[in-house]
């Protein structure tokens, strides 16, 4: 919500109006996690290691690029990875559901489809993570399961936890939902195995993730152009991600001129009517996540900008070694 990251009078008023509900949310979350720890609520232990990539705050922190980077790193070490996801926004005919690289994003969800297309590993979506893991293990010889999101899904036991922090917004006003963006308080970070800062260091760790765009890809023809080729052309841009402004800022950092921008909600279901606001004579830029949903009605001057995550720091290399060693010992 807009006021989570603002400090004006109306934002402060909304925080205090919602603060009692945040206390209830926090209390229920603490009790629920305690019940799982005491085994009063049952949880599932996978026969192969499980790595959670999650966050403490809601939306737009960079989990999916981090997940793709991690998958590729483990692949380069000869580790067979399977990815599970709740599949937010998906409308599959059944669950668990194995995502195909040419899937309909309405069926698979945008982020699971993007992970499958960028990595080639098996991706399974289901609200029931246990069923997703069991299907992956039944059909693929996975050494490691990576869960895209699910840090607070304590019904699934985990061997490793990674938290991705938005280096620009961090934790907003510091309150838990609904008064603030947090699902859990920052003291939870003391328990995780690795903290990744997206874009800027936050002081919570020295591991930095940079999202690096190299070119724009045409949705219709597949043609690739360097971003600098668009520097003298007025552009339009849309983003249906957790933090759209990050995408717009990235384009402006490459000296691109954005004449019109439009933010949509995360996981937006697009159709051609959403783009009536924009001139068909000007190039329209979007994220790769949005592009997987817009191809069926794309116009010839629509482009998406894929980004490659680059995660730096000694902590991440030590983490990769620890995970690889545990997998080796379990084989």
From Swiss-Prot:
Documented EC number(s): 2.7.1.130
Keyword Glycosyltransferase: no
Alphabetized GO MF terms: ATP binding; tetraacyldisaccharide 4'-kinase activity
Top-rank taxon, per record: Bacteria
Keywords: ATP-binding, Kinase, Lipid A biosynthesis, Lipid biosynthesis, Lipid metabolism, Nucleotide-binding, Transferase
Lipid metabolism is among the record's keywords: yes
Residues reported to bind ATP: 57-64
GO CC entries: plasma membrane
Reactions catalysed according to its record: a lipid A disaccharide + ATP = a lipid IVA + ADP + H(+)
Pathway in which the depicted protein is active: Glycolipid biosynthesis; lipid IV(A) biosynthesis; lipid IV(A) from (3R)-3-hydroxytetradecanoyl-[acyl-carrier-protein] and UDP-N-acetyl-alpha-D-glucosamine: step 6/6
Pfam short name (any one): LpxK
GO terms under biological process: lipid A biosynthetic process; lipopolysaccharide core region biosynthetic process
InterPro entries, per database record: LpxK, P-loop_NTPase
EC supergroup of this enzyme: transferase
NCBIfam families reported in the protein's UniProt record: lpxK
Family label: Belongs to the LpxK family.
Biological role stated in the UniProt entry: Transfers the gamma-phosphate of ATP to the 4'-position of a tetraacyldisaccharide 1-phosphate intermediate (termed DS-1-P) to form tetraacyldisaccharide 1,4'-bis-phosphate (lipid IVA).
PANTHER family: TETRAACYLDISACCHARIDE 4'-KINASE (PTHR42724), TETRAACYLDISACCHARIDE 4'-KINASE, MITOCHONDRIAL-RELATED (PTHR42724:SF1)
Protein's recorded name: Tetraacyldisaccharide 4'-kinase
């Amino acid at each position: 919500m807009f006021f989570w990251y603002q400090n004006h009078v109306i934002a402060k008023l909304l925080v205090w109006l919602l603060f009692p509900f945040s206390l209830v949310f926090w209390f229920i979350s603490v009790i629920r996690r305690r019940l799982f720890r005491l085994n009063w609520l049952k949880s599932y232990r996978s026969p192969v290691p499980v790595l959670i990539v999650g966050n403490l705050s809601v939306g737009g922190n960079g989990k999916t690029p981090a997940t793709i980077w991690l998958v590729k790193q483990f692949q380069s070490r000869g580790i067979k990875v399977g990815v599970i996801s709740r599949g937010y926004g998906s409308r599959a005919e059944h669950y668990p559901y194995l995502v195909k690289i040419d899937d309909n994003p309405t069926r698979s969800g945008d982020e699971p489809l993007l992970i499958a297309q960028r990595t080639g590993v098996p991706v399974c979506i289901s609200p029931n993570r246990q069923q997703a893991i069991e299907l992956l293990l039944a059909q693929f010889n996975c050494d490691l399961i990576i869960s895209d999101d699910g840090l607070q899904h304590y019904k699934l036991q985990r061997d490793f936890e990674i938290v991705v922090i938005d280096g620009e917004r961090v934790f907003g006003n510091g309150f838990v939902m609904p008064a603030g963006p947090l699902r859990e308080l920052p003291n939870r970070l003391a328990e995780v195995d690795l903290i990744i800062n997206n874009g800027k260091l936050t002081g919570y760790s020295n591991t930095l993730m940079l999202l690096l765009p190299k070119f724009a890809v045409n949705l219709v023809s597949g043609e690739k152009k360097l971003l600098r080729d668009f520097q003298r052309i007025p552009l339009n841009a849309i983003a249906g991600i957790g933090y759209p402004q990050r995408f717009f800022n990235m384009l402006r950092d490459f000296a691109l001129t954005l004449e019109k921008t439009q933010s949509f909600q995360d996981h937006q279901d697009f159709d051609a009517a959403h783009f009536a606001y924009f001139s068909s004579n000007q190039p329209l830029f979007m994220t790769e996540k949005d592009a997987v949903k817009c191809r069926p009605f794309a116009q010839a001057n629509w482009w998406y900008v894929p980004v490659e995550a680059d995660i730096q720091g000694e902590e991440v290399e030590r983490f990769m070694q620890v995970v690889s060693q545990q997998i080796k010992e379990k084989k």
